[in-house]
Swiss-Prot record:
Top-level taxon in the UniProt lineage: Eukaryota
Subcellular location: Cell membrane
UniProt-recorded name of the protein: C-type lectin domain family 4 member G
Transmembrane segment boundaries: 32-52
PROSITE patterns for this protein: C_TYPE_LECTIN_1, C_TYPE_LECTIN_2
Cystine residue pairs: C264-C278
UniProt signal peptide: none
Domain C-type lectin: 172-287
Function, in words: Binds mannose, N-acetylglucosamine (GlcNAc) and fucose, but not galactose, in a Ca(2+)-dependent manner, in vitro.
Glycosylation: residue positions: N73, N159
Tissue specificity note: Expressed exclusively in fetal and adult liver and in lymph nodes. Specifically expressed by endothelial cells lining lymph node and liver sinuses (at protein level).
InterPro entries registered for this protein in UniProt: C-type_lectin-like, C-type_lectin-like/link_sf, C-type_lectin/snaclec_domain, C-type_lectin_CS, CTDL_fold
Gene responsible for this protein: CLEC4G
Length: 293
């Protein structure tokens, strides 16, 4: 039987019957191979698409889960933010209340401080009045003693019970006076007088002032008088026994508190008074003490 050789796709050859029957057999196999190839390709594409769809579905599910998680977290964060806002509001209200209480407390404290200052001022004034009263009482006692000494002076020749003034001291109306030659500061002068059981001179009136003027011997002397200041300004003058100044014998234009530091008073050689710095060493001093009777 005649045969015809045909080549297959794979490179090998195949013998088929010759003639029309052989050619028919050969060409009838080709559509089968084509259909098989198309089927295989389709299956492959179906598998690939199935894999891609499965992967896309998985990723979509993951994205949806992530989106749900984000929404859940966002809801939680929103709730937490709302809670924080409420807490901030509560804190703001609390702070406002505390601030109001603080302002009220400050106002009450200010009122209490004002009342305390008023009470302290009243107490200070009362203390000053008591001190002034005691000093004036002491001065009154000394005045009575002076009058008594004057009465005793009238019978001095018949009664010599009072001790004489120390050597270099001058006597006048029941008191002894010492006029220094050296010069020093006001504080040192007061110390010198205290060492002699005396004090810087207190001028009680015109008679005593005349006695002092007559014995200046051309020198200046510290008196027992100092300025009283309040808030840096001179409010008055006070003797060393605590009594405020009543009698005065100021020089013209005095006291002037030059440079705001003239706190002590001295007597010029003319007998007139002048305010001066307490640390000045240009003047002597006059000590005074009562006779020892």
């Amino acid at each position: 039987m005649d045969t015809t050789r045909y080549s297959k796709w794979g490179g090998s050859s195949e013998e088929v019957p010759g003639g029309p029957w052989g050619r028919w057999v050969h060409w009838s196999r080709r559509p089968l191979f084509l259909a098989l190839a198309v089927l295989v390709t389709t299956v492959l594409w179906a598998v690939i698409l199935s894999i891609l769809l499965s992967k896309a579905s998985t990723e979509r599910a993951a994205l949806l889960d992530g989106h749900d998680l984000l929404r859940t977290n966002a809801s939680k964060q929103t709730a937490a933010l709302g809670a924080l806002k409420e807490e901030v509001g509560d804190c703001h209200s609390c702070c406002s209340g505390t601030q109001a209480q603080l302002q009220t407390t400050r106002a009450e404290l200010g009122e209490a401080q004002a009342k305390l200052m008023e009470q302290e001022s009243a107490l200070r004034e009362l203390r000053e009045r008591v001190t002034q009263g005691l000093a004036e009482a002491g001065r009154g006692r000394e005045d009575v003693r002076t009058e008594l000494f004057r009465a005793l002076e009238a019978v001095r020749l018949q009664n010599n019970s009072c001790e004489p003034c120390p050597t270099s001291w001058l006597s006048f109306e029941g008191s002894c006076y010492f006029f220094s030659v050296p010069k020093t500061t006001w504080a040192a002068a007061q110390d010198h007088c205290a060492d002699a059981s005396a004090h810087l001179v207190i001028v009680g009136g015109l008679d005593e002032q005349g006695f002092l003027t007559r014995n200046t011997r051309g020198r200046g002397y510290w008196l027992g008088l100092r300025a009283v200041r309040h808030l840096g300004k001179v409010q008055g003058y006070q003797w060393v026994d605590g009594v405020s100044l009543s009698f005065s014998h100021w020089n013209q234009g005095e006291p002037n508190d030059a440079w705001g530091r003239e706190n002590c008073v001295m007597m010029l050689h003319t007998g007139l008074w002048n305010d001066a710095p307490c640390d000045s060493e240009k003047d002597g001093w006059i000590c005074e003490k009562r006779h020892n009777c």
